Amino acid sequence: MTMLWVCLAGGLGAVARFLLDSRINSRFSVPVPLGTLVINVMGSLLLGLITAAALNHLGFSQNLKEPLGTGFCGGFTTFSTASVETARAAYGCGRRVGALHCMGMAIAGVLAAILGLALGSRV
């Protein structure tokens, strides 16, 4: 049954990513794809919160960890799209822009995950 919930949550995460990415990229015209950056950082924060809540047993059911963490966050965030968009930014805007985009996303994602773990531990 858990696998079914992971699949359903993953589908919801993918739809949420599509809608949010479309909305962000239609509103902001920047040289790098802002939508994927925002989504991956948000997903890192959310996964940190989920992980901390599950590890600390803060009223968070272990049955929700896989569907929300692996399913929703896995469907919501996207490493492959980020990789392609970074390569396109490097090709279209220069290697420096591509490298900054890549490093910025990685650093922001890790910091967001740390923040999520910290916040989730205090709830």
From Swiss-Prot:
Annotated organism of origin: Cutibacterium acnes (strain DSM 16379 / KPA171202)
Name of the protein described by the UniProt record: Fluoride-specific ion channel FluC 2
Membrane-spanning residues: 1-21, 30-50, 99-119
Membrane topology listed for this record: Multi-pass membrane protein
Chief location bin: membrane
Activity control: Na(+) is not transported, but it plays an essential structural role and its presence is essential for fluoride channel function.
Keywords, in A-Z order: Cell membrane, Ion channel, Ion transport, Membrane, Metal-binding, Sodium, Transmembrane, Transmembrane helix, Transport
UniProt-recorded Gene Ontology molecular function terms: fluoride channel activity; metal ion binding
Biological role stated in the UniProt entry: Fluoride-specific ion channel. Important for reducing fluoride concentration in the cell, thus reducing its toxicity.
Name of the encoding gene: fluC2
